[in-house]
């Protein structure tokens, strides 16, 4: 199983998962169809399926264009709001392409129809992979926008947190540096946070993705997976796990640094990349 990490938009990740024997491929969270097709063409693979983690535009805006270019393409997810959806998936459902298996894990919290995807390959020594969208990120998680903190706790602690610790975690955004800065505020004495933050700063300086992490690593430095730890409880002033999680989300929202609006030239470049502006002007 080969995973191509594809940075797009401002800080999103798309993924192309390749079955190296059959040359079949599955895409996850198609934000920019043209970029995905470019990578697929370069790899010489046949794209057979799109898996969307949730319906937000920055994870699905390329679905319709891709489905138009590739008639018969399966576009799958758990939420009817997903653009160009061809079939709705259920929690625990299994999919397969070649020797690669996919287990669909419903992880509500960020959105009510958020689905994460757990992949492994037959007779392969590589670690399994989790494509977690905005449910779980490196040292963080997505805001719970449509569900309760209890549902989000269930998703993080029970559904994802019990997967094998060697599982590689591929998330939907590059928010690692700010997530770790917040984690350091929550647990200033956590050596795992400090070490990961130093590593992430080096990656950021070199403009290198910080994905994947592993689930075992996340359990050591991600405060949203550490809601039963004394230091995290003390930071929030709460004891019950769901209440700790909700307090963390509130504090993380306050901690989010203010971002200066981009300059006009930068806005134009982003608009071109997002397909909101054409390079061909009418005369």
From Swiss-Prot:
Record text on cofactor binding: Binds 2 Zn(2+) ions per subunit.
Binding site for Zn(2+) 2: 58-59, 134, 173
Keywords: Hydrolase, Metal-binding, Zinc
Key word Zinc present: yes
One GO biological process term: methylglyoxal catabolic process to D-lactate via S-lactoyl-glutathione
Residues engaged in binding Zn(2+) 1: 54, 56, 110, 134
Keyword Protein biosynthesis in record: no
The protein's name in its UniProt record: Hydroxyacylglutathione hydrolase-like protein
Organism annotation: Mus musculus (Mouse)
Lineage start: Eukaryota, Metazoa, Chordata, Craniata, Vertebrata
